[in-house]
Design a protein with these regions (language model features):
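Catalytic phosphate/metal-binding cores of nucleic-acid and nucleotide-processing enzymes, i.e., regions
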Residues: 1-5, 132
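Conserved P-loop
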Residues: 4-94
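Hydrophobic/aromatic ligand-binding patch that stacks against planar heteroaromatic rings
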Residues: 26, 50, 126, 146-147
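Hydrophobic anchor at the start of a short beta-strand
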Residues: 34, 136, 154
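Conserved nucleotide-binding/hydrolysis micro-motifs of P-loop NTPases
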Residues: 40-43, 65-67, 110-111, 142-145, ...
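Phosphate-binding/switch loop-helix module in NTP-utilizing enzymes
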Residues: 72-132
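Sensor-1/coupling segment of RecA-like P-loop NTPase cores
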Residues: 128-144
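Phosphate-binding/switch region of NTP-binding enzymes
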Residues: 141-176
Length: 176
């Protein structure tokens, strides 16, 4: 069997998580065990209401001890949240083993690395030593120095226009 591949969906445009979720639904529809792990989001996004009910689809609960965005946290809060993110990564690795996943989606993991909450080297080590049949999708603003050379696919979502630029808020059912 051919070794599974690594995908990165990055950029400042909308659609990274949407593309990753779309691929995960396709894989699940083919009978693949899927693990979805969201790193910097709470577990209230609308798609989770559907995904949690799919057979062979496993969601690793995100760390949600704060209502703040990371940029709003003080140094102590960032340190504590970073510990939770590292534990979340360990839980994700265990879920891959437990469910014999063939697809792993790590949503916003690249941003967790960029913010210093997760080691780029630890992520790259996992990618290099993952099971041969584990396809991996990672999302975030930009590939990291260690993940960039490991990726087979890198797709950049570019923002041309976004309602947020006009001060409009995210909408239930569309953005979350």
């Amino acid at each position: 069997m051919e070794k599974a591949r690594i995908h990165i969906y990055c950029g400042d445009g909308k659609g990274k998580t949407t593309a990753a979720i779309g691929l995960s639904v396709r894989s699940c529809g083919r009978g693949w065990p899927v693990v979805l792990s969201q790193f910097l989001k709470g577990s209230t996004s609308g798609e989770l209401n559907v995904l949690r009910n799919l057979p062979n689809y496993h969601y690793v609960e995100a760390p949600t001890t704060t209502c703040k965005f990371v940029f709003q946290m003080d140094d102590q809060e960032k340190m504590e949240y970073g510990q939770q993110v590292r534990q979340h990564f360990a839980d994700t690795v265990e879920a891959v083993k437990k469910y014999h996943a063939k697809l792993l989606v790590m949503d916003e993991v690249l941003d967790a690395v960029a913010m210093g909450m997760l080691s780029d080297e630890a992520l790259a080590e996992f990618l290099r030593n993952r099971p041969e049949d584990l396809e991996v999708v990672m999302t975030g603003r930009a590939p990291t120095p260690c993940t960039n050379p490991l990726a087979d696919y890198i797709t950049r979502m570019q923002k041309v226009r976004h309602p947020f630029d006009k001060g409009l808020n995210a909408r239930l059912g569309v953005e979350f």
